[in-house]
Structures are given as C-alpha cells and as structure tokens.
C-alpha cells in the first residue's frame, strides 16, 4: 500500500533533482522540445511508462512544451509512486 512521502525523503529527492519543483501537494516540471512532434513523442513514451508503473501524470501540452504535475489524488499528496514516476521520466529524458 502506498503512503504519503516523508518530508525528508521529498527534500532528498528535490536536492538530487532540482528541476522538479514542490507546489503544495504536487511535484512539477516543465519540459521544452524543438517542436510539437518531439513533445508528443515524449508524451507517448511517458504514457507507456505510466502504464507500466500504474501511476499517471496530470499534464498539459502547448506546442513544444509539456508540463507535468505529479500527485496521488486518493492520498491527498505526494507519494513514493510520484517520486518513482518522476525518476523514470528523468531517466527517459536523459537517455
């Protein structure tokens, strides 16, 4: 069973991944690509990752930008699932 992440765990994640921002009960990040096709391709890869992890982002796409917000709605905040997905997204973008 997944539970809310402890503050020290969240602080550690942000320290290692400063491009993710804490916003209330969410972690968020904006990605910028050369064009819409690259942005949409990235979203497709994240969608497949999300299915594999069984945790899905709230996101927005405007042309070459993708904004991702991660939270666990049924827990009312940030959980290990959000951190796991954020790390997987960063690994994907850096590969």
Swiss-Prot record:
Known catalytic reactions: (4aS,6R)-4a-hydroxy-L-erythro-5,6,7,8-tetrahydrobiopterin = (6R)-L-erythro-6,7-dihydrobiopterin + H2O
Gene3D superfamilies cross-referenced by the UniProt entry: Transcriptional coactivator/pterin dehydratase
Keyword Ribosomal protein: no
BP GO annotations: tetrahydrobiopterin biosynthetic process
UniProt xrefs under Pfam families: Pterin_4a
GO molecular function, one term: 4-alpha-hydroxytetrahydrobiopterin dehydratase activity
Main enzyme class: lyase
EC number: 4.2.1.96
Keywords for the protein's UniProt record, in alphabetical order: Lyase
Highest taxon, organism lineage: Bacteria
Entry annotated with the keyword Lyase: yes
PANTHER family, sorted: PTERIN-4-ALPHA-CARBINOLAMINE DEHYDRATASE (PTHR12599:SF0)
Family label: Belongs to the pterin-4-alpha-carbinolamine dehydratase family.
Record's protein name: Putative pterin-4-alpha-carbinolamine dehydratase
Annotated organism of origin: Prochlorococcus marinus (strain NATL2A)
